[in-house]
Every structure is written in structure tokens, then in C-alpha cells.
């Protein structure tokens, strides 16, 4: 399967390629938008390096070594704000969780179903 996407955001952004090898999890690769971290600074600057360190927690998409992929896209609807007394997770951490821990699509669904989702930045999102 091939997956493609664009970054046609309102504001200019720098896409950072993120390779992650979590201890006890699956290796993955994906992109983070540095403007979501408050900077588009060059990586040779202090601000750029600080943003790059946060890249694994600001990914917009990725695929892990098992072939599980996840992409987040924005919606024009009321932001998700579940409250069913489950542990809370936000959009970025949901992506990290799936990439690090899911070996199949069903595992990804099961992992995410264990949390109350809270959308970030006042927007609503969906995953594919």
C-alpha cells in the first residue's frame, strides 16, 4: 500500500523527518511539522534543535516496522473532547502510541479505544 499526503497548511512549515527506535517498541519513520512546535528555525539554531528533539511527539504521520501506518488530518467540526473516565490522550500522543506499540490495525484500534481522546489546538481530527 502507498500512502501520500500534502502539507497545505495556512502557515509555512518545515517538515522534519523523524526516525524513532523506542526501547521495547517498534521502530518507525514519519514527519513532524516544526511550526506545530512554535518554530520553523533552522536545525543549526538552538530553537531548531529544541524543536527537533520534540519531533517524535509532534508527528503528523508515520509507519512502523510492522507496516502499521497512521496519518492525522484536520476536520472542520467541533474538537473531540471525550469524557468516559478512561485515561486521557491527545492527538500527538495517539500517533506515537500507535507507531510504538501496534503491530496490526486491530491492535491500533484496541490501543486507542482504551483512552479518551482530546483534540489539540482547537481543531478536530481524524486518523487514517
Task: Tell where the protein language model's regions lie, with residue ranges.
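A contiguous strand-loop segment
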Residues: 1-86, 122-123
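Alpha/propeptide regions of enzymes that mature by internal proteolysis
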Residues: 70-72, 76, 84-116
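Internal, well-folded beta-alpha domain core
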Residues: 110-128
Amino acid at each position: 500500500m502507498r500512502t501520500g499526503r500534502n502539507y497545505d497548511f495556512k502557515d509555512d512549515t518545515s517538515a522534519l523527518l523523524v526516525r524513532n527506535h523506542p526501547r521495547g517498541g517498534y521502530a518507525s519513520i514519519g514527519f513532524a511539522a516544526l511550526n506545530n512546535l512554535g518554530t520553523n528555525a533552522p536545525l543549526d539554531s538552538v530553537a531548531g534543535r529544541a524543536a527537533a528533539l520534540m519531533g517524535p511527539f509532534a508527528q503528523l504521520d508515520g509507519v512502523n516496522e510492522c507496516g502499521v501506518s497512521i496519518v492525522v488530518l484536520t476536520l472542520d467540526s467541533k474538537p473531540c473532547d471525550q469524557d468516559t473516565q478512561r485515561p486521557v490522550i491527545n492527538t500527538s500522543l495517539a500517533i506515537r502510541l500507535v507507531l510504538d506499540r501496534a503491530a496490526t490495525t486491530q491492535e491500533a484500534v484496541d490501543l486507542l479505544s482504551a483512552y479518551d481522546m482530546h483534540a489539540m489546538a482547537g481543531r478536530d481530527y481524524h486518523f487514517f
